[in-house]
Amino acid sequence: LRQDLIGDGWRVRQHDFVSTTNDTPLKNWVISEFNQSGAVVKSLLIIGHFAIPYSGNFAPDGHSERIGAQPADVFYADIDGAWTDSTVTTNNNGSIYTPNEPNDGNWDQSIIPSPVELQVGRIDMHSMDGFALSEIELTRQYLNKNHAYRHKLINPARKALLNTHLDNSIPHTSAVAWRSFAPMVGNTNITL
């Protein structure tokens, strides 16, 4: 992957963290790299099972039982925003999925506190229990397939799958997908 990224024109900076490290040391490293680079660092790719920051007090999918902190890798991408863990108290009827309380390690913000400076992505095959392969083997398989795609060793079918069930509660949500998918794969290659 490193050579593929360099071949694509990226400058790669790498740091290895123990998977039990919480989100703050990883973010501090990202901030340090960003500042040392003179803002040349533009993207962050997290590979492996590292801390997933949780933040906020909302339910983006409209399910009230999920109100609380949601996964927020954007925490890593916001270099200078003020993220706090002191005010949100979630009353979500005992749901174990998304609790958020003051000083619990989950951030308060439901809205990103400042414009993000970085793109962020994650390749994490942890808890993929539906597969017989280990986390390491699944990651290796993904990276090998990624390499094959970049070098045109495979040519996957161009198609998209569109689920419109949220249109009932949030009108026109699928319109964005239609507008995005059609130019990428063509109208006839979209499956509902």
Please identify what each model-predicted range represents.
Residues 1-192:
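Cysteine-dependent hydrolase recognition
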